[in-house]
Amino acid sequence: PEKESAAFFFMFLAFNLFLASWNSKKEIPRYLLAFLAGLSTAAMANIWGAYVYIYLGIAVPSLIAFLIGKVGKKETSTYSIWLFTSFIVIVFISKKFTINEIIHSTYISSSIAVLFIFIMHFILFNTKIKAYLEKGYHSKIPNRATTLIISLIILFILSFVFFGQNFVANELS
């Protein structure tokens, strides 16, 4: 049977719902649309293996939006609801994938890394750490670049600790 046609429906639905959520001015519709985008992502994952393109197609533009200063609390909540909804449905409801398979997927782990960067930015620049980062030579580096550098270092260390020394090299090759 033609599964690609159904999968494309869910892929474009996920993209459209995510964008509608990202651009929504009101909280409840934003959360609902992000939730539905997560369900659409999970539906495609259950139909066709090309679901990873949804994760990549949302993670990369979201990271670019972050770097140009278009991501705040609203966008972070949208992104996290979409990501967690899709994970919960894929792992716990459909049982098609395990948590280990999700974490070891380069495409999906890149979506997790983008969320980590968003959260790290909030932690670094909305707490007392901000005062330290704005002193001395740190003050010359843009906030988002500082967040990106610190986040990538932390993610590299965490992947080294939890997955071993060859994880990053194997994923990049």
Predicted regions and their residues:
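Short acidic/glycine- and proline-prone juxtamembrane loop motifs at membrane-interface regions
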Residues: 1-5, 49-50
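Alpha-helical transmembrane segments of multi-pass membrane proteins
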Residues: 5-16, 34-37, 54-58, 83, ...
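Small-residue packing motifs within transmembrane alpha-helices
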Residues: 30-38, 53, 82, 109, ...
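Transmembrane-embedded, aromatic-rich helix segments that form part
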Residues: 51-64, 108-114
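Membrane-interface alpha helices of multi-pass inner-membrane proteins
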Residues: 33-49, 87-96
